[in-house]
């Protein structure tokens, strides 16, 4: 799964919601301030999180001179939308803010990117020090479960988290099904792409 997403490492859990909450639990110890994009899913909700935008402008807190570690929370494709969000605005944040980006790819994994790998691997903004993705596998993959992907250090931290160790894992049969159906997922994604291009020619 990590190879498909093009991440260094990944692990599965019982749901996308749990994936988000576990990732946030680890990041809470490493973050001075959280910021969230509009319409961010509940899986990435933090009570102390500040809005990324105030009005139609960047939150002034993102532009001040305070050196701090911040985590930005967002869906890659928010609910009720069909296009991925534009993350280039993160380049406007000054270098004194050490940025971790946590994205929810529940509505893009299996749909966007090469062969449906999502957009995680395409996020390469110079201002981002660390990027992490979580997703539900119950959308395009049709299997109950969730995934957390990122760099090896972060995933190793996840594996040692007491909450992760004691939580329910993804159904083993579903994990095996996902591996066995790799070729089928690829075929179906190619079919989807072809059908969308066909529809697009008549719109």
Predicted regions and their residues:
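Active-site PLP attachment segment
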Residues: 123-157, 170
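Active-site phosphate-binding strand-loop segment of PLP-dependent enzymes
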Residues: 55-103
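A short glycine-threonine-serine/GTX helix/turn-capping micro-motif
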Residues: 144, 161-170, 187
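Conserved PLP-anchoring active-site segment centered on the Schiff-base-forming lysine
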Residues: 13, 23-43, 197
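Catalytic P-loop NTPase motifs of RecA-like helicase/translocase cores
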Residues: 80, 108-110
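Short loop-beta-helix segment that forms the pyridoxal 5′-phosphate
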Residues: 1-22
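Conserved PLP-dependent catalytic core of the aminotransferase class-I/II
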Residues: 174, 178-203
């Amino acid at each position: 799964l990590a190879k498909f997403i093009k991440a260094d490492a990944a692990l599965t859990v019982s749901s996308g919601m749990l994936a988000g909450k576990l990732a946030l639990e680890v990041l809470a110890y490493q973050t001075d301030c959280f910021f969230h994009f509009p319409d961010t899913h509940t899986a990435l909700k933090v009570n102390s999180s500040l809005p990324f935008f105030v009005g139609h402008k960047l939150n002034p807190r993102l532009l001040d001179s305070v050196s701090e570690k911040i985590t930005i929370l967002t869906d890659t494709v928010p609910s009720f939308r069909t296009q991925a969000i534009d993350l280039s605005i993160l380049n406007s944040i000054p270098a004194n803010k050490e940025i971790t980006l946590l994205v929810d790819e529940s509505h893009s994994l299996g749909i966007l990117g090469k062969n449906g790998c999502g957009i995680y691997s395409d996020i390469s903004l110079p201002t981002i020090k660390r990027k992490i993705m979580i997703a539900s596998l119950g959308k395009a993959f049709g299997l109950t479960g969730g995934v957390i992907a990122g760099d090896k250090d972060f995933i190793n931290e996840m594996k040692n988290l007491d909450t992760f160790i004691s939580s329910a894992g993804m159904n083993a049969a579903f994990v095996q099904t996902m591996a066995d159906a790799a070729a089928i997922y690829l075929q179906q994604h190619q079919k989807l792409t072809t059908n969308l291009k066909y529809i697009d020619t008549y719109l």
